[in-house]
Regions:
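ABC ATPase nucleotide-binding domains
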Residues: 81-84, 88, 92-235, 239
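Conserved ABC transporter NBD signature motif
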Residues: 58-70
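Non-catalytic connector elements of ABC transporters
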Residues: 243-248, 252-370
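The feature captures the beta-strand-to-loop junction immediately N-terminal to the Walker
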Residues: 35-37
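Conserved A-loop
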Residues: 11, 21-26
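ABC ATPase nucleotide-binding domain
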Residues: 5, 25, 61, 345-347
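Helix-to-loop junction immediately C-terminal to a conserved catalytic motif
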Residues: 50
Length: 370
């Protein structure tokens, strides 16, 4: 499977810039998700790689082939880029059986009957849809139609499989099942997958790397846990995670050492020990980012607040804690319920607390209430 490289790729419509100077490399056999809010440029990026949209400028390389170069006037057609595309709408032929839907494209590619039969059986077995061979799309469930669409896309052995929000039409239970199937399929096929979604849960669970985009600009391009634990900026920290990260304004009180400072946090003193050298002053616009799991509720905790709301979800419970005029989120394992305004004691733990200077991440570190 090929390596894909985008070099200074930009797409404009008039004065509107959909994708701004994007540089990224998709390595062989990676599962990449293009993630971001609606209108951020993720689908435009996918379409430019596929050749369905022409960039305003830049260069795109698939394998050893330059498929687009604005300076050289190169723009290879989608049909010659050897990619498979799976859309939100599965676009199955309603008058064709499952077998015919899968083989129709291979017939147009002039494959031999023997090769068509062998490949169709291979992908149907891979997707576990052999029993539906003679059924029509209307006789299948949404998940079964999804599998047929994937089988049809994989049948010609494309170098890369592109997917544009393919699970968005499914219910929550089926989406969960199909995430499992897609991840296993990626392993079984040894293919390169590029997947567009606005659902951060899909991105976190499926991807080997996440490309998070906002307003056409790449904000971070890293493995899911790196994006979660080491967000580049406030946008990334806020977009990834459910419940979202807690953000609390802080002021510098004292510089203890190059990697250690005392901060004023909700009217309390907080010792922050960073993993790298800090470069902050009294004028710095500081914000602490704390994931809900780093605020455990414990008797005798260093901080005290009151229960604003309790949101039990069976396996885990989200507790909204009011402390002064700030509402914080804490997540605990199991089912628990607090009365409104009940006193809650909690701590700050862990070494994944992020200190932001303005809109830039300064360092990851641990914090201790003094």
């Amino acid at each position: 499977m090929p390596r894909i490289e985008l070099i200074n790729v930009t797409k404009r419509w008039g004065n509107f810039t959909a994708v701004d100077n994007l540089n990224m490399v998709i390595e062989d056999r990676e599962f990449i998700t293009l993630l971001g809010p609606s209108g951020c440029g993720k689908t435009t990026t996918l379409r430019m790689i596929a050749g369905l949209e022409t960039p305003t400028s830049g260069k795109i390389i698939i394998g050893e082939d330059v498929v687009f170069d604005s300076e050289e006037g190169i723009n290879v057609s989608p049909a010659k880029r050897d990619i498979g595309f799976l859309f939100q709408n599965y676009a199955l032929w309603p008058h064709m059986t499952v077998y015919k839907n899968i083989t129709f494209g291979l017939e147009n590619l002039k494959w031999s009957k023997q090769d068509i039969e062998a490949r169709a059986l291979e992908v149907m077995k891979m997707l576990k849809i052999e029993e539906f061979r003679d059924r029509y799309p209307a006789e299948l469930s949404g998940g079964q139609q999804q599998r047929v669409a994937i089988a049809r896309t994989l049948a010609p052995r494309p170098k890369v499989l592109f997917m544009d929000e393919p699970l968005s039409n499914l219910d929550a239970k089926l989406r969960g099942e199909m995430r499992t199937e897609l991840k296993r399929l990626h392993t079984d096929t040894n293919s390169t997958f590029v997947y567009v979604t606005h659902d951060q849960l899909e991105a976190m669970t499926l991807a080997s790397r996440i490309c998070l985009i906002e307003k056409g600009i790449m904000q971070q391009y890293d493995p899911p846990l790196t994006v979660y634990n080491k967000p580049n900026n406030l946008f990334v920290a806020d977009f990834i995670g459910n419940p979202t990260m807690n953000f609390i304004k802080a002021k510098l009180v004292e510089v203890v050492s190059p990697k250690e400072v005392v901060l004023d946090f909700l009217g309390r003193k907080l010792l922050y020990t960073a993993g790298e050298e800090l470069n902050v002053t009294e004028e710095s616009d500081l914000t602490l980012g704390i994931r809900p799991e780093f605020l455990p509720i414990v008797d005798g905790g260093a901080l005290t607040g009151t229960a604003y709301s309790t949101l039990p979800a069976g396996m885990e419970t989200t507790i909204k804690i009011k402390i002064d005029d700030t509402i914080l989120s804490s997540v605990v394992f199991g089912s628990i319920d607090y009365a409104v305004d009940q006193e809650i004691q909690f701590n700050i733990v862990g070494d994944g607390i992020v200190l932001f200077d303005g809109h830039n991440r300064v360092a990851l570190g641990s914090a201790k209430v003094l």
